């Protein structure tokens, strides 16, 4: 899939910039054992300071043990490192896996039980529901390097939907009623926002005096079909000095129903067209 990316070249003779469009061909491959280290790095990035709580090594192995489910994005052939991954895990089937148990416990503790997201999580992650033979929940794992364009996400989600359909047609355990998406966000305080020169989006949230922004641009579209969502502080977050400059990181969880999966894919296909620009 060719996508045009802008490459900025500084002009040493002036303060201006010449902008050149560079076409990058992204290739999609199923997750494979050769991707172990790169996928583990992406998971560490996704879970940020709390990654150590989830036995990321075992979670990586679980992801790579699923044939035919999920995709990675590479630019230099199948043997190169992936720059992005999208997959889904059956929380019910894997409820006793150490990583899934840790993630389930973590989310139930992080999100207030009385909130809409807390109620939704309790409805689908209680021990009785997890042990049921139907009404399963899929944990969507989605992460990419920060410079990867969101235009890679529509085909990845479209392929994931097709893979899940094929799997359920073969009676494999990928029939879900709901999905949980774990994501990341960050915030500046108002003074830092002005200092960066970043234009403020039309839709924004105030959180502890700062502007909440998404690392994953597609979160905006997932929220349109979501049952509930919540942001939470990392347990092992890095504290900044009062005068230090940077961003505060936070976690995000979004719950949406299977009935809205195709609607969500259509939204991101319209929001992130993959044609050359």
Where are these regions (language model features)?
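Intrinsically disordered, low-complexity, positively biased terminal segments
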Residues: 2-277
């Amino acid at each position: 899939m060719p996508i045009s990316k802008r490459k900025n070249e500084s002009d040493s003779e002036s303060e201006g910039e010449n902008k050149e469009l560079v076409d990058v061909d992204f290739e999609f491959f199923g997750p494979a054992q050769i991707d172990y280290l790169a996928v583990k790095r992406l998971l560490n990035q996704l879970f940020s300071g709390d990654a150590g709580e989830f036995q990321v090594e075992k979670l990586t192995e679980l992801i790579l043990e699923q044939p035919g489910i999920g995709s990675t994005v590479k630019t230099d052939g199948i043997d190169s490192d992936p720059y992005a991954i999208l997959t889904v895990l059956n929380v019910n089937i894997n409820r006793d896996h150490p990583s899934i148990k840790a993630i389930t416990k973590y989310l139930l503790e992080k999100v207030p039980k009385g909130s809409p997201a807390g109620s939704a999580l309790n409805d689908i992650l209680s021990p009785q529901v997890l042990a049921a033979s139907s009404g399963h929940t899929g944990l969507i794992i989605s992460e990419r390097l920060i410079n990867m364009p969101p235009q890679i996400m529509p085909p990845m989600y479209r392929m994931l939907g097709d893979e899940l359909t094929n799997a359920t047609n073969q009676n494999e355990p990928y029939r879900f009623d709901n999905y949980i998406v774990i994501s990341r966000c960050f915030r500046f305080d108002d003074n830092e926002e002005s200092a960066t020169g970043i234009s403020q989006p039309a839709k924004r949230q105030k959180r502890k005096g700062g502007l909440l922004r998404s690392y994953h641009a597609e979160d905006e579209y997932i929220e349109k079909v979501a049952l509930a969502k919540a942001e939470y502080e990392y347990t092992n977050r890095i504290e900044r000095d009062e005068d230090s400059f940077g961003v505060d990181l936070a976690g995000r969880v979004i719950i949406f129903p299977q009935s809205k999966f195709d609607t969500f894919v259509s939204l991101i296909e319209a929001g992130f067209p993959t044609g050359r620009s």
